Amino acid sequence: YGLVGSEMCIRDRPLSERIAYAPFEKLVVSAEEAAQHVNHGDRVGISGFTGAGYPKGLPTAIAEKAKALHEKGEEFKIDVFSGASTAPDCDGVLAEAEAIRFRSPYNSDPTLRKQFNDGTALYQDIHLSHSGQQVEEGFYGDFQVAIIEAVRITEEGHVVPSSAVGNNLEFIEAADKIIIEIN
């Protein structure tokens, strides 16, 4: 559905070397543009397993969108699913923007933990090995967006995931829209 090329990727190698599949060239957008496809109430599956393999740029863009909408008095909260914990530039920025309504299966961010404890965000603590199966079996309903980190898209269109795959396959199969962040 969309490709996000982060600044990290651009400094390392030209984005054209990372996205070698010609039909995808026209799909490249900024993180801010991609964030416009994530809406209030969406169920969002993100790649990653611990502090690796999660999207780096898009969570900040989604957090900025949430802050702007909150300043206008509009609601913006999403349900976030991953393979495990992420890091401050994912869970942390979304929590600080009060953009998370529900989080599963794991959290290690102190701001988000406070929100769970004060009831402003919901949390489901399940065994990590069950989370993908529950998504696959439809326990949570439809997913609107999957945000997957990758290091490259080959000439044949194969997506090369980064260092932590987590529940990528389950999120891709469950989501209406897929955003691939190239890092």
Q: Model-found features: residue ranges?
A:
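A broad, low-specificity signal for short, low-complexity segments enriched in glycine/proline
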Residues: 6-7, 105-110, 137-143
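Short glycine- and Lys/Arg-enriched binding-loop motifs that mark or flank ligand-binding interfaces
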Residues: 1, 44, 153
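Single conserved hydrophobic/aromatic residue that forms the stacking wall/gate
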Residues: 1-5, 9-10
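Short, basic/glycine-rich phosphate-binding loops at helix/coil junctions
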Residues: 12-14
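Alpha-helix C-terminal capping/helix-to-coil transition sites in glycosyltransferase folds
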Residues: 4-5, 37-40, 142, 174
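N-terminal active-site beta-alpha-beta segment that forms phosphate/nucleotide-binding
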Residues: 16-114
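Internal alpha/beta core interface subdomains
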Residues: 113-183
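Gly/Ser/Thr-rich beta-alpha loop segments that engage phosphate groups in nucleotides
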Residues: 4, 50, 159
